[in-house]
Amino acid sequence: MHKGMLVVVSGPSGAGKGTICQEIRKRNPNLFYSISATTREKRVGEIDGVHYYFIDRQQFEKMIANDEFLEWADVYGNYYGTPKKPVFEALARGQDVILEIDIKGARQVKKTYPEGVFVFILPPSISILEERLRKRGTDKEEIIVKRMQMAWEEIANCDWYDYLILNDDLETAVNDLEAVLTAEKLKPKRVNYRVLLEGGVLER
């Protein structure tokens, strides 16, 4: 009945987009969650092929040259990118796909796949965002300062997204994202009317 739908979830570092996406996956096991490739070091608890594909710069640059990314960016000296092939294969199977990427990557996807659904996650406040980043304990002070500057810029330029979700309560934010998925699936452009007619669902 439904075509595969590409959902792009973005937000400042520390806004909680990763946690929200994890909860959505638990509720919707049939969703295809795209795994990004990166050249950054693994953080404690991260698993290669689960959280990211951890590769070296040479391999990443080879993939760029071969046009293997749907989007990619250099973020604070590390490459991040979304491999194109698994995303388009999942969409072709009729699976809905979740991409958790930054705003630069989202803009790239918007140009190449404008029919996607674009969702921006807002933090409760800038001060709480900074507190979350510091609690991580994974970044040096100069990186935290850069992330905060970037957060201001991203929030100031997020009005082109289809949906804005405030993450001041995790369960509410997850419910909001699930409501977005449900509403988008019901839009006429995503419904295959021929299947409805041939299946006898719609009768005169």
Swiss-Prot record:
Pfam families: Guanylate_kin (PF00625). One of its GO terms (cellular component) is cytosol. Residues 4-182 form the Guanylate kinase-like domain. Its EC number is 2.7.4.8. SUPFAM superfamilies: P-loop containing nucleoside triphosphate hydrolases. InterPro entries: GK/Ca_channel_bsu, Guanylate_kin-like_dom, Guanylate_kinase, Guanylate_kinase_CS, P-loop_NTPase. It catalyses: GMP + ATP = GDP + ADP. ATP binds at G11, P12, S13, G14, A15, G16, K17, G18. It is found in: Cytoplasm. Keywords: ATP-binding, Cytoplasm, Kinase, Nucleotide-binding, Transferase. GO terms for molecular function: ATP binding; guanylate kinase activity. The keyword Nucleotide-binding applies. PANTHER family: GUANYLATE KINASE, GUANYLATE KINASE-RELATED. HAMAP family: Guanylate_kinase. Belongs to the guanylate kinase family. NCBIfam families: guanyl_kin (TIGR03263). Essential for recycling GMP and indirectly, cGMP. This is Guanylate kinase. It comes from Carboxydothermus hydrogenoformans (strain ATCC BAA-161 / DSM 6008 / Z-2901).
